[in-house]
């Protein structure tokens, strides 16, 4: 599954709206659950969304670090590395974010992504 670009993500949502169906979204907590979600989407011949919670993001960084930003980046890197092995499009999301994690998790991720966009990545 190719990781969705802004354009392919919008197209995925437009197709779902026109077809009157929902895009499946699965919370993932590890490389195993991410791989299982990708396989499930492929088996169902469906695009999909994978989401990482604040706890899942912390787990991805390693149990001795619990760094949500590093874990989120690791999740995304792994998804990009294996995503092309599967057909379809997959969107990457963070799951619900408690307000107490906005400044230490979501805002840094947004800053990192803004810098990547500036560099054309």
Predicted segments, located by residue:
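N-terminal amphipathic alpha-helix/helix-capping segment at the start of soluble metabolic enzymes
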Residues: 1-24
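Conserved active-site and cofactor/substrate-binding residues in soluble primary-metabolism enzymes
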Residues: 4-8, 28-32, 70-74
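Generic secondary-structure signature for well-ordered alpha-helical cores
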Residues: 14-18, 39-46, 80-84
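Gly-rich Lys/Arg/Thr-decorated short loops/hinges at beta-loop-alpha junctions or inter-strand turns
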Residues: 16-20, 51, 58-59
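Structural preference for beta-strand elements that scaffold enzyme active sites
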Residues: 21-25, 47-51, 85, 89-93
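Conserved, mostly hydrophobic/aromatic
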Residues: 27, 37, 95
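Catalytic domains of carbohydrate-active enzymes, especially glycoside hydrolases
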Residues: 32-52
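Active-site beta->alpha loop and helix N-cap motifs at the rims of alpha/beta catalytic domains
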Residues: 54-121
């Amino acid at each position: 599954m190719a990781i969705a670009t802004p354009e392919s993500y919008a197209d995925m949502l437009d197709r779902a709206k026109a077809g009157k169906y929902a895009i499946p979204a699965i919370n993932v907590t590890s490389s195993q659950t991410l791989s299982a979600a990708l396989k499930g989407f492929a088996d169902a011949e469906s695009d999909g969304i994978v989401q990482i919670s604040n706890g899942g993001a912390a787990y991805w960084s390693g149990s001795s670090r619990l760094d949500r930003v590093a874990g989120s980046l690791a999740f995304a890197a792994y998804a990009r590395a294996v995503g092309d092995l599967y057909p379809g499009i997959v969107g990457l999301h963070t799951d619900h974010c408690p307000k107490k994690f906005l400044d230490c998790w979501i805002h840094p991720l947004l800053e990192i992504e803004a810098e990547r966009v500036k560099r054309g990545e």
